[in-house]
């Protein structure tokens, strides 16, 4: 399970250090793809297989299902950690996530997946989430 929030920098070659706590589960390789809210998602091969099966079950007759499949699969790349525990982020995914070369990134664990965010975007998303969480607690007790 992937937990926590970590600050890193995307290096000049488009690589991001993956926290050491996450590396063991990624030793057999992983898939990097587009995530919600302009983040990138890293999935283990097992999680990717499960997601692929769910995507295959979506009706091809629904436009939103086709668009979702296109977004997830066309942006996906097989990847592997290098000897320094870094993962290469291709240019198309850097553009999607608004993460510039030498830019600040936030790597978060979200249970079964890892998300990579532009730190600027992450702060905005996190502020919104914290506000919503506070409101949910007020309503639910």
Task: Give the positions of each predicted feature.
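Flexible "stalk/tail and boundary" regions
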Residues: 1-8, 12, 22-79, 83, ...
């Amino acid at each position: 399970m992937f937990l926590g929030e970590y600050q890193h920098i995307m290096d000049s070659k488009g690589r991001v250090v993956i926290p050491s706590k996450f590396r063991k589960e990624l030793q057999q390789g992983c898939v990097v793809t587009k995530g919600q809210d302009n983040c990138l998602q890293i999935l283990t091969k097992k999680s990717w297989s499960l997601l692929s099966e769910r995507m295959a079950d979506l009706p091809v007759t629904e436009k939103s299902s086709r668009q979702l499949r296109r977004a997830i699969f066309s942006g996906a790349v097989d990847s592997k950690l290098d000897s320094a525990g870094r993962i290469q982020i291709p240019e198309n995914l850097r553009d999607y996530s608004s993460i510039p070369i030498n830019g600040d990134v936030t790597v978060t664990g979200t249970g079964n997946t890892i998300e990579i965010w532009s730190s600027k975007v992450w702060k905005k998303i996190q502020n919104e989430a914290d506000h919503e969480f506070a409101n949910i607690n007020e309503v639910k007790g």
